[in-house]
A protein has these predicted regions:
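Long, low-hydrophobicity ectodomains and other hydrophilic envelope-associated domains
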Residues: 1-119, 123-126, 136-138, 145
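Alpha-mannosidase-like glycoside hydrolase catalytic domains involved in N-glycan trimming
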Residues: 130-133
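C-terminal beta-strand-rich structural cap/linker in extracellular carbohydrate-active enzymes
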Residues: 137-157
Length: 157
């Protein structure tokens, strides 16, 4: 937990199987070894982006990866008491929940020819392929609202 700069508080997780940035991270780049996460601008300046190795020995090896990326969350017609958004009292709203799909890029320290990616639907099934581009010899994919998802699958060959 890094709370050294007011308004930029964040948690960075860097383990062999999970890389994650949580908090007020808009516009910063996080080089976590074989994975780099660059959160974009969000409604509240806050997001959570997690990159988890589901299969394989490491992010530079063959395997599969799950990415989850979210920002602002609230129920439909949720009634905040004031602009600080610290309480809704008893006005929790109703379904469906509304979740901000954040803009971010995630890069892997492997060639783009080794990587395929998909946006996942609400059942965890592949919904559409996501472009993977080469940037400085690394495979980079762009997350965001056009994909209409919070979850992505990445396959490294």
């Amino acid at each position: 937990w890094d709370a050294s700069t007011e308004g930029r508080e964040r948690v960075v997780i860097d383990t062999p199987r999970t890389k994650s940035v949580i908090g007020f991270t808009d516009g910063d780049a996080f080089d976590l070894g074989a994975v780099t996460i660059r959160p974009g601008v969000t409604r509240q300046g806050w997001s959570t982006i997690s990159v988890t190795l589901m299969e394989g020995e490491g992010f530079g090896e063959a395997g599969s990866v799950l990415i989850a990326a979210t920002g602002d969350v609230e129920n439909t017609n949720m009634g905040w008491k004031d602009a600080t958004r610290t309480s809704v009292g008893r006005n929790w709203g109703e379904a469906p929940s509304l979740v901000e799909a954040v803009t971010a890029s995630v890069s892997f320290a492997v060639g783009s020819h080794r990587v395929s990616a998909w946006a996942l639907d609400e059942r965890g099934q592949r919904a559409e392929e996501v472009d993977v581009v080469s940037e400085d010899g690394h495979a980079r994919l762009q997350l965001g609202p056009p994909h209409r998802t919070l979850w992505y699958e990445v396959e490294i060959r």
